[in-house]
């Protein structure tokens, strides 16, 4: 049944949901990649759709908003109230290393964070916020499409405008390729409620070089990561 934030019914969502931050990007993904897509949520403008990919697989796509608090609400409700088993975040990140280029795809197998949300979940202990191994493996295998992607830890920040830029030097030292705002929270929610999750990001801006993409491009393109996400679902179904 409907929740305070999702006006759908059980069965409206597929067991796999792709989740961009921007609900308009969710609409673009549904229009571009899914057949017979229908709207299943519009509460607060957080659009959600369910359709079929390549005539073979029912898949849903829905926005999750910005930051861990927002994405945690939506992912929790999808899992506990609508039977969703797998979440794939498809979003943007900022690069912190010179060798990472604009529009590259980064598969986040783990997520460091300055947020305290997972400590609240885990009785004030550190929780290893990691993606499901099988989902990571299939995303890597989906690179056979000819799409280049890199795999690394990423960093989920609570603040978009950080007051301490020296933290980027620490991230670079530890091999982190990108900064975003949600993955650690999504991995925590998935672990708490027995689901699986993965984050795939496209580099939308570069913290070192100050290069950036424009909002319209982020909304309607970045299709390589979407292809990896969708094809990884088909690979999973073959197991």
Curated annotation (Swiss-Prot):
GO terms for cellular component: cytosol. InterPro entries: DeoD-type (IPR004402), Nucleoside_phosphorylase_CS (IPR018016), Nucleoside_phosphorylase_d (IPR000845), Nucleoside_phosphorylase_sf (IPR035994). Belongs to the PNP/UDP phosphorylase family. One of its GO terms (biological process) is purine nucleoside catabolic process. This is Purine nucleoside phosphorylase DeoD-type. The lineage of its organism: Bacteria, Pseudomonadati, Pseudomonadota, Gammaproteobacteria, Enterobacterales. Its EC number is 2.4.2.1. NCBIfam families: deoD (TIGR00107), PRK05819.1 (NF004489), PRK13374.1 (NF009914). GO terms for molecular function: purine-nucleoside phosphorylase activity. It is an enzyme of class 2 (transferase). Catalyzes the reversible phosphorolytic breakdown of the N-glycosidic bond in the beta-(deoxy)ribonucleoside molecules, with the formation of the corresponding free purine bases and pentose-1-phosphate. Phosphate binds at residues 21, 25, 44, 89-92. The keyword Cytoplasm does not apply. It catalyses: a purine D-ribonucleoside + phosphate = a purine nucleobase + alpha-D-ribose 1-phosphate; a purine 2'-deoxy-D-ribonucleoside + phosphate = a purine nucleobase + 2-deoxy-alpha-D-ribose 1-phosphate. The active site is at residue 205. Keywords: Glycosyltransferase, Transferase. Homohexamer; trimer of homodimers.
